[in-house]
Amino acid sequence: MGKRIGLFGGTFDPVHIGHMRSAVEMAEQFALDELRLLPNARPPHRETPQVSAAQRLAMVERAVAGVERLTVDPRELQRDKPSYTIDTLESVRAELAADDQLFMLIGWDAFCGLPTWHRWEALLDHCHIVVLQRPDADSEPPESLRDLLAARSVADPQALKGPGGQITFVWQTPLAVSATQIRALLGAGRSVRFLVPDAVLNYIEAHHLYRAPH
């Protein structure tokens, strides 16, 4: 039996309990051997002022420390060129055994935007796609995805077979926490305790991150 590896990408600016709860639920539901949180690279002009990619990575490392099955994959931040998901998948897949299963977790909104992604039709050559559905999400996928869904979608998440190639949907009731809200609270000098893991809070406070400029 091959290993079951999940990839969960995000800007994690900062990583918060909503991300962590989704990660733990997915690792359990899909019986993953490992779920890698994958901080996404951004052009320097899109980074939050005063918070570097290295600091976003450091927060994720602290969030997953000691959490069974959760790890960090920093490869997108270590590239010196634009970071496309297909490049990441090819690079991860090249390190795995042929029978290892790779699951890429993405949100509904990201999934609906899939046809705009670089070489999007090749994504399923390397992984299964698990779409996290929210109860409040618009439930009709765009026209451009209908054929793909008809050919590749599997109703039962437990029925995904082989190293990749299929799409399934998982319902999650996400915690009402957002990175935008957390940045706003910190900018206003307010507490974000219990919205981020304690180790992340300690790092934010030690490095004075997300503070309003004085």
Swiss-Prot record:
Keyword rRNA processing: no
Pathway it works in: Cofactor biosynthesis; NAD(+) biosynthesis; deamido-NAD(+) from nicotinate D-ribonucleotide: step 1/1
Domain of life: Bacteria
Entry EC number(s): 2.7.7.18
Keyword Nucleotide-binding tagged: yes
SUPFAM superfamilies, alphabetized: Nucleotidylyl transferase (SSF52374)
InterPro entries: Cyt_trans-like, NadD/NMNAT, Rossmann-like_a/b/a_fold
Gene Ontology molecular functions: ATP binding; nicotinamide-nucleotide adenylyltransferase activity; nicotinate-nucleotide adenylyltransferase activity
Example GO biological process: NAD biosynthetic process
Keywords: ATP-binding, NAD, Nucleotide-binding, Nucleotidyltransferase, Pyridine nucleotide biosynthesis, Transferase
Catalytic activity: nicotinate beta-D-ribonucleotide + ATP + H(+) = deamido-NAD(+) + diphosphate
Role this protein plays: Catalyzes the reversible adenylation of nicotinate mononucleotide (NaMN) to nicotinic acid adenine dinucleotide (NaAD).
Family designation: Belongs to the NadD family.
HAMAP family named in the record: NaMN_adenylyltr
Protein name: Probable nicotinate-nucleotide adenylyltransferase
Organism: Pseudomonas aeruginosa (strain ATCC 15692 / DSM 22644 / CIP 104116 / JCM 14847 / LMG 12228 / 1C / PRS 101 / PAO1)
